[in-house]
Amino acid sequence: MQSWYCPPVPVLPGRGPQLRLYDSADRQVRPVAPGSKATMYVCGITPYDATHLGHAATYVTFDLIHRLWLDLGHELHYVQNITDIDDPLFERADRDGVDWRDLAQAEVALFCEDMAALRVLPPQDYVGATEAIAEMVELIEKMLACGAAYVIDREMGEYQDIYFRADATLQFGYESGYDRDTMLRLCEERGGDPRRPGKSDELDALLWRAARPGEPSWPSPFGPGRPGWHVECAAIALSRIGSGLDIQGGGSDLIFPHHEFTAAHAECVSGERRFARHYVHAGMIGWDGHKMSKSRGNLVLVSALRAQDVEPSAVRLGLLAGHYRADRFWSQQVLDEATARLHRWRTATALPAGPAAVDVVARVRRYLADDLDTPKAIAALDGWVTDAVEYGGHDAGAPKLVATAIDALLGVDL
């Protein structure tokens, strides 16, 4: 599937330190050590509604990683999926009386516009689940063949769905570190079906949902139906990149069940101990002290902000003001502060000269390499900007160097 426009990324002189990121599986910050080509898989949207700031914060986070790898001289193979086979999409299409494919196409187009406006670098492979059915079927066949999957007995219900055995890998649970009770609760809350009759274990995850009347379905050797959520990402990642990813990423709400099962699906057929070397998760974004949710009706949409002539660079800078792993709140104050900061940065970098900037660029690189510490990086830049505006300087190349660093590393257009 076509992604979005890729803005040019300027090249800074020199190199920054090695990137270190918090790994959700190991529960610690440690170095990310990609090979000749870095690999990253980030879970994409379910295209049934417009992009809100929670989505934006996640993709801006992984855009920082993308930019830091480029700054380190790495090539990158970045894959992102589109979950265009999922119940929320079908339910929204039914509610609105539109074809689910048309709804998905419209929302994907809007998402791409939002990402381009926020200057998020696109993935090399942008893959809809509907484009990878054959890969999913092949992966399910392998899981059935090795005993990691089973078909629900016909005596237990009309539909012979296929499930993945949660105990198919000895290491199941390492990615989240959650206990069984927490896993069961989150399965119930996040699209699982622990109470489904006929399952070997309540935690077992759906791989193939046999066709039901009125639901979209695709042909397969085990009958018409559609894939489960987790196998979509496992199949797309394995077919586009292979096992042993440098990073699997997404929002913190994907730690379990989605990323745990995606990893287990891949590991049971690849034989790898870990699907990814790093599991990286971004925190959630709330609005004015409340969780942002459709039920509350308090979603802040990127497209709505753009329609109000809010500058996307200010939105991006506002999201970067907090640490990526922290759950945090968006507010008018956050936006106002980001807008004012953007104006100050533009004023300073437009000066004919300023204080020497080599040190501040080195500090920005160092802070970002330390688990994407954007608050410290922004504070360092604020310090240089204050000195430039209030005291001036004699380095004619400094303003341009700072502007280039802000563009290349933070993705903010001045």
UniProtKB/Swiss-Prot annotation:
Pfam families: tRNA-synt_1e
Motif residue range(s): 'ERGGDP' region: 189-194
Residue positions binding L-cysteinyl-5'-AMP: C43, G44, I45, T46, T58, N81, I82, T83, W229, G251, S252, D253, I285
GO BP of this protein: cysteinyl-tRNA aminoacylation; mycothiol biosynthetic process
Catalytic activities: 1D-myo-inositol 2-amino-2-deoxy-alpha-D-glucopyranoside + L-cysteine + ATP = 1D-myo-inositol 2-(L-cysteinylamino)-2-deoxy-alpha-D-glucopyranoside + AMP + diphosphate + H(+)
Location of the motif 'KMSKS' region: 291-295
Cofactor binding remark: Binds 1 zinc ion per subunit.
Cofactor: Zn(2+)
EC number(s) stated in the UniProt entry for this protein: 6.3.1.13
Motif ('HIGH' region): 45-55
GO CC field: cytoplasm; cytosol; plasma membrane
Positions annotated to bind Zn(2+): C43, C233, H258
Molecular-function annotations in GO: ATP binding; cysteine-glucosaminylinositol ligase activity; zinc ion binding
Keywords: ATP-binding, Ligase, Metal-binding, Nucleotide-binding, Zinc
CDD domains in UniProt: Anticodon_Ia_Cys_like, CysRS_core
Family: Belongs to the class-I aminoacyl-tRNA synthetase family. MshC subfamily.
Subunit and partners: Monomer.
Function: Catalyzes the ATP-dependent condensation of GlcN-Ins and L-cysteine to form L-Cys-GlcN-Ins.
HAMAP family in the cross-refs: MshC (MF_01697)
PANTHER family associated with the record: CYSTEINE--TRNA LIGASE, CYTOPLASMIC, CYSTEINYL-TRNA SYNTHETASE
Record-given protein name: L-cysteine:1D-myo-inositol 2-amino-2-deoxy-alpha-D-glucopyranoside ligase
Organism: Mycobacterium tuberculosis (strain ATCC 25618 / H37Rv)
